[in-house]
Structures are given as C-alpha cells and as structure tokens.
C-alpha cells in the first residue's frame, strides 16, 4: 500500500459463492465470496451476483461494496501461516497498490477503462469485525486481533453505476480536505472523532480509542435504502474532482 498513491489495480471482483448457515441472529451469511471472471455490473446498491445474508447489519446504500487491500491480506497470510485468497475477508473488491484502510472518508474512486461505463465509488465507513467473521475465519480471538491490527478495509457507496473487472485501474478522482481516514474513524484517533460522542447511542467513551459507533446505531445505518447518518465533514468538495 502507498498512502500517497493515486491509482491501484483491481485484483479481483468477488461475489457470494453461496449463502451459508451461520450461528448468528440472521442464521445465514453471504461472507463466502469468490473471484468472478469477466465484467461484473455494479448497480445503485449492489454488485451483480452478490448476496447479503444479514440485511439488517449489512448492505444498503453506504455499504454497497466492501474493499480490502491485498497488501493487508499478505500481512495476515504471513501471520496466520495460511493462504488468504481474494474474497477471504468477505470483500467485494480486492485492491492492490492503493490505500484502502488509510483512504480518506468521502474519497472517490473510478474503476474501469471506459469512462462512460466506469463505476464511481465513494469511501464511506470502516468494517467492524463481527462474530460471523470470526466463525468464518476460525482463528482464535479473531475479532480482537483484527480490531487491534485495524487494517479493516472500507465500505463503499455507488456514485455512478458501471461495469468492472479484474485488472481494471482503480483511480482516485477526488479526496475531501477534512483528511479523516477510514482507520482514524475506526480507531477514533482523529481530532473530529475525539470531539464527538463515543460508541453507543448514549455517547459512551467520549474521546476514547475504539471501534466505531455501537450496535444500535449500526443497525439503523445498515438498513437498505436509508441514507447515511455519518457525522462527518463534507465528503466530496467538487473543486477537488479531476477529469
């Protein structure tokens, strides 16, 4: 990863291989994702062929896609002593050569060679590891380890639907000036986060490092069709857009 890079490569586009039974509240999960061959369409809130097992906590406008960086996956592969192929983290987009967890909230990416058919995506939220993720990975203390590493990847919303495929260039086309990154929002280490109430609907943990807002607010945020309630600076100043 290079935090100053303005482009990277889409290594794989991954969709649900099959909905699996899960011990969580939803009883099923679409976390098992595998790379697709050929072009894949991105619509307003979904990647073609992808499925969401728990629609209360996943999917929707601000979590239409999930991106994870291959350099972060390679670090986990070394630490875990196992292969970590694209899709293993449940990601829709496996990206190389571009900051994902260290992307600025509201940053926009254009993916695809044909600009008329390219997709434009906007970085929205960090991924919060859950028990479904832990059951899928089958590594001890996984939620704690993943949280402490904080290489969590980024959720994306669809600004412009399009078609993408493995090998496409991922180009940064705009970056908001507030500078708050996905990692900072997740760990609550940015100055703006310190001035806001901490996790949970009652504002527990003001100014304290830790994951992003608690389950009750997460559940509301994840419902399909709802608009974002993220308390952040302006995400997308148009004067930073490149052609």
Label for each model-derived stretch:
Residues 106, 161, 165-167:
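Loop/turn positions that initiate beta-strands
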Residues 144-145:
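A short, contiguous structural element within a folded domain that forms the immediate neighborhood
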